[in-house]
């Protein structure tokens, strides 16, 4: 461990905003937990009163002040910390840390940056330095030029040739970014981008390529491995925060996956990152060509997703690594004993964003390289069909799955497919039902045929269910397969009985038939520790794809179930996660077994350490 680390300053992320939400409450809480375990005094700077990390007992001292250079310097002057953690408060903390470093404030007070150095952070944040650094090891980046004036920007765009991509340095959630087909569009976007950042990057457009992400961790002894691989359902051109994301990767073969994994470890080593980082690639499967789009040398939204997807506590381990521990040393502590081992998944997860665009009159529903989504969900299952259907129900906007959403209809399908909006996934369903081929849809959307083929399976099975007129006529094998493919009782009732109204009676008829045939979901564990003792874990999900329970229910013990609030949305955010966490903690203190049901990967409530059992699944009558 870093010598003489008696007091450490942790920079939080401040107010929630698009591109920076509850995931940093989760990562910051994990970092503070790691410090407490080491007996290190922690000082937190975060003005967000709705977070878990600012609650009593998490940090030793909390300053509800802005995360800015002026205020943080005053806190450093008063508290005299030995070290500072910058990677757990998102872009806000990273930018503040970079300013503290460049202004000499950290050196002035003898504060050591723990984990990844500020120099390495600057390599990833300054687009020009980033490209030059990766060129040293012959890693491909988009043809680009960093500029700081409109005159240079126009010259760069003309040299590269339209269409071009514009990105802002030190920006959050793709702010000020976009693809420009011509100079008129470019002038408008570049002017807007310079309002957010003094430097922008003009680069070749790779729109339509696959977007692949890796979460990688490295310690000071240079042990490095991939914790999770993730694939964006939507092609490049749509921000990863706006895209459906699936883990593990689905459409890559073993050779392609191995190549990108090896490039990831090569990249993190050359940049000198110590801790966790997220690497994003553009990938062309037709040519095996790639570009490194971005590296985040900090905990991110994708890090929280990877942690919940795999059960590997990335933020906790990253904090320990920042303190100087190696991954094998963390493993020997038994917290967790998986720190030295890459997680193995026998299931799929799917992240789906939630938008609240209808609350703002005149706002464009088109999605692209800048984030508009305000929340997200994560579904877990044994097939893509299952997780996409579960996930679309979890969003909480009245959808019943991929099919069966009678209130959604599109007049111009070609436009809806080629110019994506927040409803494009439902346009895919209508297109398939209207006879569009997978080849035609791929041409319009550039979504990989692997995903489209799985979605077509759902549409085809809807037609199979619609051939029955009575619930009691559905054979057991047909009903079971429908559940395996993620169909809810409501969907089955709609396709078989075609009723009007709220369908409560028909829904119960399907439920009764299913139970009569013994078609019930199994409770399965996620192996959070990748060890010889998976039966010890309490991270659970439900699926119809396999038989048998991995848990025994509490029989002679009192227990309390806490229902989480699901995806963040306007009017329901991290404050309800605070309520959920405090509820399970209070239940535990009173001697009850605490059970949490929630499906938001950004939250502290979906950390399996917070309760006796975590069910990462739907909040619905069918799951009750």
Where are these regions (language model features)?
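Periplasmic-binding protein-like
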Residues: 82-88
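Extended, domain-scale alpha-helical bundle/helix-rich regions
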Residues: 482-485, 491-498
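Short Gly/Thr/Asp-enriched flexible loops that form oxyanion-binding sites at enzyme active sites
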Residues: 91-109
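ATP-dependent carboxylate activation and anion-phosphoryl transfer catalytic cores
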Residues: 2, 6, 12, 25, ...
């Amino acid at each position: 461990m870093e010598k003489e680390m008696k007091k450490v300053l942790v920079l939080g992320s401040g107010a929630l905003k698009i591109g920076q939400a509850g995931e940093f409450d989760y990562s910051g809480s994990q970092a503070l937990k790691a410090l407490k375990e080491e007996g290190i005094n922690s000082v937190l700077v975060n003005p967000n009163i709705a977070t878990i990390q600012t609650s009593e007992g998490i940090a030793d001292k909390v300053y509800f002040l802005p995360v800015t250079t002026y205020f943080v310097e005053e806190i450093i002057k008063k508290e005299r910390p030995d070290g500072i953690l910058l990677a757990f408060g998102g872009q806000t903390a990273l930018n503040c840390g970079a300013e503290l470093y460049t202004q000499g404030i950290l050196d002035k007070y003898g504060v050591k940056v723990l984990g990844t150095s500020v120099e390495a952070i600057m390599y990833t944040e300054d687009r020009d330095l980033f490209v030059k650094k990766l060129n040293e090891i012959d890693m491909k980046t988009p043809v680009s030029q960093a500029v700081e004036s409109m005159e240079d920007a126009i010259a760069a765009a003309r040299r590269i040739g339209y269409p071009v991509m514009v990105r802002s340095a030190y920006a959050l959630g793709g702010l000020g970014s976009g693809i420009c087909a011509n100079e008129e569009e470019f002038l408008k976007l570049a002017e807007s981008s310079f309002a957010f950042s003094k430097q922008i990057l003009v680069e070749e457009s790779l729109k339509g390529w696959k977007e692949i992400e890796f979460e990688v961790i490295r310690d000071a002894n240079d042990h490095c491995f991939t914790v999770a691989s993730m694939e964006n359902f939507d092609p490049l051109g749509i921000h990863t925060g706006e895209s459906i994301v699936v883990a593990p990767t689905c459409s890559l073969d073993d050779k392609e996956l191995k190549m990108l994994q090896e490039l990831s470890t090569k990249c993190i080593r050359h940049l000198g990152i110590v801790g966790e980082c997220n690497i994003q690639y553009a990938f062309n499967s037709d040519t095996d060509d790639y570009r490194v789009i971005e590296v985040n040398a900090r905990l991110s939204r994708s890090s929280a997703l990877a942690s919940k997807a795999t059960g590997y506590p990335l933020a906790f381990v990253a904090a320990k690594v920042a303190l100087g521990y190696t991954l094998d040393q963390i493993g020997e502590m038994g917290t967790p004993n998986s720190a030295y081992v890459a997680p193995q998944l026998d299931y799929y997860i799917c992240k789906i964003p939630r938008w609240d665009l209808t609350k703002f009159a005149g706002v464009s529903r088109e999605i692209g390289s800048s984030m508009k989504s305000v929340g997200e969900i994560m579904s877990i299952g044994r097939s893509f069909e299952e997780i996409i259907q579960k996930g679309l129900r979890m969003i909480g906007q009245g959808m019943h799955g991929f099919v069966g959403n009678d209130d959604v209809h599109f007049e111009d399908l070609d436009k809806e497919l080629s110019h994506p909006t927040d409803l494009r996934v439902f346009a895919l369903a209508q297109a398939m039902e209207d006879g569009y081929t997978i080849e035609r849809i791929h041409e319009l959307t550039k979504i990989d045929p692997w995903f489209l083929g799985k979605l077509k399976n759902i549409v085809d099975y809807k037609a199979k269910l619609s051939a029955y007129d009575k619930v009691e006529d559905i054979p057991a094998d047909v009903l079971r397969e429908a559940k395996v493919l993620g169909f809810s009782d409501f969907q089955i009732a709609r396709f078989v009985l075609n009723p009007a109204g709220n369908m409560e009676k028909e829904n119960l008829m399907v439920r009764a038939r299913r139970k009569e045939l013994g078609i019930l979901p199994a409770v399965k564990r996620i192996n959070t520790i990748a060890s010889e003792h998976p039966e010890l874990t309490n991270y659970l999900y439900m699926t119809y794809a396999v038989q048998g329970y991995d848990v025994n229910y509490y029989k002679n013990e009192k227990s309390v179930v806490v229902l989480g609030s699901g995806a963040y949305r306007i009017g329901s955010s991290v404050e309800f996660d605070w309520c959920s966490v405090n509820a399970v903690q209070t239940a535990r203190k009173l001697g009850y077994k605490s059970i949490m049901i929630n499906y938001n990967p950004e939250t502290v409530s979906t950390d399996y350490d917070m309760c006796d059992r975590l069910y990462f699944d739907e909040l619905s009558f069918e799951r009750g």
